């Protein structure tokens, strides 16, 4: 289970994750996710074009958990490469959600969302919430193109394997 420590979570958050997992065993469960979009069979669109998922989706490799909402990873759901710290730091050092998603896909583990996915995040730092903090945050770094670079690093490094897994599931049209 992963969750950010700077987010307020509602009281039933963990219970919702667990109940969804019981109905979808052998599936990674996200309380917040985006739907990955592609330009073509081997070309992924930029992160800002991936829409937030606002309702339960069938398990899919294209459901991309956003770590801030919390994600339940069942035992052995991720590739053993997840522990390759050097590769993680090389490909996506500030985007662990990108790394964890790839490690799930490479282990042939699909992802789904809770019935009512989180649409809005409430941060503990109210200055960040209203946009008045001057500090550079991981979120602001990734929003300024950091996510796209790290996503492309993953797709380029694990090409064609990661595309083949997704394409074999016939999810990309």
Each language-model region and where it sits:
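Short, flexible active-site loop motifs that bind/organize anionic cofactors or intermediates
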Residues: 4, 68, 90-91
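Conserved catalytic core of nucleotide-sugar-dependent glycosyltransferases
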Residues: 8-86
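Short beta-strand-to-loop acidic/aromatic patch adjacent to the donor-nucleotide binding site
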Residues: 1-8
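Glycine-rich, histidine-containing beta strand-loop boundary motifs that form or position
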Residues: 4, 32-33, 115
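C-terminal catalytic/acceptor-binding lobe
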Residues: 80, 85-173
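Generic secretory/membrane-interface signal
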Residues: 1, 24-26, 91
